[in-house]
Amino acid sequence: MMYEKRSYTGYGHPSSHYDYPPPSGPPGSFYLADVPPQHFYQWRSPPGIVRILQGSVVILCLVIFACVASTLAWEYYGSGGLLGYGGGLGSYYNGYYGGYNGYYYGGLTNPRAANGFMIAMAVLCFLVTLGLVIAGLSKASGARSRRFYLLVAVLSGLLAFVMLIASIVYVVGVNPRAGLGASSGSLYYNQMLMLCNQMMSPVAGGIMNQYLYHYCMVDPQEAVAIVCGFLTVILLCVICYFAQKTRHKIWKYGKPNIFWDKPLATAEGPNVEEWVKNVSGDVGTQDETATLAYSEKPISPLTSAFLPAQENGYGHSTPSSPSVPPPEGPSPPEEKDKGSVSRPPARRGHRQRPRPTGLEESQYETDYTTAAESSGEQNRDDWASLYPPIISDAIRQTYKAEFNNDLQRYKALCAEMDDIGTQLRQLSHELDCLPEGSLRYQGVAEEYNRLKDLKRSPEYQSKKLETQSLRDKLCHIKRMVGGYDQSRS
């Protein structure tokens, strides 16, 4: 057989190749404190910081280009005007001009070459960084891999190196005092130093003074270009750091635990920590509306017809005792789910069906506890006989300890069934995107049907009813503790 079935964990495609061991749970799971989800769509995340810094580098490159280009007129036209005007000043200044001309094209830094090199490197940095920004903002899978951010780090390091060289060359080219220091004591140095010292003298006329001022002093736009050049070097080095940090997070947490796009907002149940805090408090008014189940999912309109109406926040349904045997058959929603989803892999082809809403999807995939299936009137009476109202602090501590133990068991069951529901949703999405008849499609469909069979198994149904029973028990104990605390206050 051409298709080799791989072990599937539900967090990626069964035929995908992992560069790292897959994590042990779905992204954003409440129970995986050691594997927190990474929200890479946020601007304060490492890839978000990389994009911000790259945008800053693009702006700095534009500023460098504008500032350097604004001084080119002095280099290409000011020199000719100065030498032509100085020809009539006599042999004294002609000697200096000859020395200046020898310096200008001699072994020292040529300001024209420095300007051209700075502009060329700024344009190169602008184009490369802009290309990386556009690629990083795209939703292509290649732009969300460790290999891409390795490319970002390498290119940013190379750009930082060439921009550092260009900035140093530009500083030496536009600041003759920095360049002349290397030739201290030479004839060229003495001649140019004398010209720069007489920069403010009105003897040579206005044209010579203006050009000498430009040559001997650093213009404001040249200073801005120098500062922007070194800032660009620093930002490129920081980009290298955050690109490597992004690669490390992808390797450490795994691609399934990374959100590149903002997840759709879905209705969530109450916070378990707040619930436990309210119960654990010594004094406080307990709100019975806060006794909803931790993993309770909203009811979709399609399945509400199977469920009785609710009254005072508790649904009337078949009561569950502390120990409930496994049911002989699936519940009505399960029967509907069974008839419509579990089918041969070949018949679940690529179809453009509308994606279910968060409410409807969660109802079908994690329907082990719903408000309409638990906390019936008779069930509350059963728990009231087992856990009567609290009359002393000792009984309250006993209730509280039992509440904490049952809560841990309840959370573990919810996590286990949430995991199955998450895998089914991911597999359903993959089946909608794959072409029917492909080997990859067959493998995903087999895993999908296996999980659906698991949901209909007696073991799963037993856990489902145990979760419902634990929820009713926790709600009752919470009311007893809340009533006792309220009576004392």
Curated annotation (Swiss-Prot):
<feature type="disulfide bond">
    <location>
        <begin position="196"/>
        <end position="216"/>
    </location>
</feature>
<feature type="modified residue" description="Phosphothreonine; by PKC/PRKCH">
    <location>
        <position position="370"/>
    </location>
</feature>
<feature type="modified residue" description="Phosphotyrosine">
    <location>
        <position position="364"/>
    </location>
</feature>
<dbReference type="InterPro" id="IPR008253">
    <property type="entry name" value="Marvel"/>
</dbReference>
<feature type="compositionally biased region" description="Polar residues">
    <location>
        <begin position="365"/>
        <end position="377"/>
    </location>
</feature>
<feature type="coiled-coil region">
    <location>
        <begin position="407"/>
        <end position="434"/>
    </location>
</feature>
<dbReference type="Pfam" id="PF07303">
    <property type="entry name" value="Occludin_ELL"/>
</dbReference>
<dbReference type="GO" id="GO:0042795">
    <property type="term" value="P:snRNA transcription by RNA polymerase II"/>
</dbReference>
<dbReference type="GO" id="GO:0005886">
    <property type="term" value="C:plasma membrane"/>
</dbReference>
<feature type="modified residue" description="Phosphoserine">
    <location>
        <position position="300"/>
    </location>
</feature>
<dbReference type="Pfam" id="PF01284">
    <property type="entry name" value="MARVEL"/>
</dbReference>
<protein>
    <recommendedName>
        <fullName>Occludin</fullName>
    </recommendedName>
</protein>
<keyword id="KW-1015">Disulfide bond</keyword>
<feature type="compositionally biased region" description="Pro residues">
    <location>
        <begin position="322"/>
        <end position="332"/>
    </location>
</feature>
<feature type="topological domain" description="Cytoplasmic">
    <location>
        <begin position="138"/>
        <end position="147"/>
    </location>
</feature>
<keyword id="KW-0597">Phosphoprotein</keyword>
<feature type="topological domain" description="Cytoplasmic">
    <location>
        <begin position="245"/>
        <end position="489"/>
    </location>
</feature>
<keyword id="KW-1133">Transmembrane helix</keyword>
<feature type="transmembrane region" description="Helical">
    <location>
        <begin position="148"/>
        <end position="172"/>
    </location>
</feature>
<feature type="transmembrane region" description="Helical">
    <location>
        <begin position="223"/>
        <end position="244"/>
    </location>
</feature>
<keyword id="KW-0796">Tight junction</keyword>
<comment type="subunit">
    <text>Interacts with TJP1/ZO1. Interacts with VAPA. Interacts with CLDN1, CLDN6, CLDN9, CLDN11, CLDN12 and CLDN17. Interacts with PLSCR1. Interacts with LSR, ILDR1 and ILDR2. Interacts with TJP2/ZO2.</text>
</comment>
<keyword id="KW-0965">Cell junction</keyword>
<keyword id="KW-1003">Cell membrane</keyword>
<feature type="domain" description="MARVEL">
    <location>
        <begin position="45"/>
        <end position="248"/>
    </location>
</feature>
<feature type="modified residue" description="Phosphothreonine">
    <location>
        <position position="285"/>
    </location>
</feature>
<comment type="function">
    <text>May play a role in the formation and regulation of the tight junction (TJ) paracellular permeability barrier.</text>
</comment>
<feature type="transmembrane region" description="Helical">
    <location>
        <begin position="52"/>
        <end position="74"/>
    </location>
</feature>
<dbReference type="InterPro" id="IPR002958">
    <property type="entry name" value="Occludin"/>
</dbReference>
<dbReference type="InterPro" id="IPR010844">
    <property type="entry name" value="Occludin_ELL"/>
</dbReference>
<comment type="similarity">
    <text>Belongs to the ELL/occludin family.</text>
</comment>
<keyword id="KW-0472">Membrane</keyword>
<feature type="modified residue" description="Phosphoserine">
    <location>
        <position position="374"/>
    </location>
</feature>
<feature type="topological domain" description="Extracellular">
    <location>
        <begin position="173"/>
        <end position="222"/>
    </location>
</feature>
<feature type="topological domain" description="Cytoplasmic">
    <location>
        <begin position="1"/>
        <end position="51"/>
    </location>
</feature>
<keyword id="KW-0812">Transmembrane</keyword>
<keyword id="KW-0175">Coiled coil</keyword>
<dbReference type="GO" id="GO:0008023">
    <property type="term" value="C:transcription elongation factor complex"/>
</dbReference>
<feature type="domain" description="OCEL">
    <location>
        <begin position="381"/>
        <end position="489"/>
    </location>
</feature>
<feature type="modified residue" description="Phosphotyrosine">
    <location>
        <position position="368"/>
    </location>
</feature>
<feature type="compositionally biased region" description="Basic residues">
    <location>
        <begin position="345"/>
        <end position="354"/>
    </location>
</feature>
<feature type="transmembrane region" description="Helical">
    <location>
        <begin position="113"/>
        <end position="137"/>
    </location>
</feature>
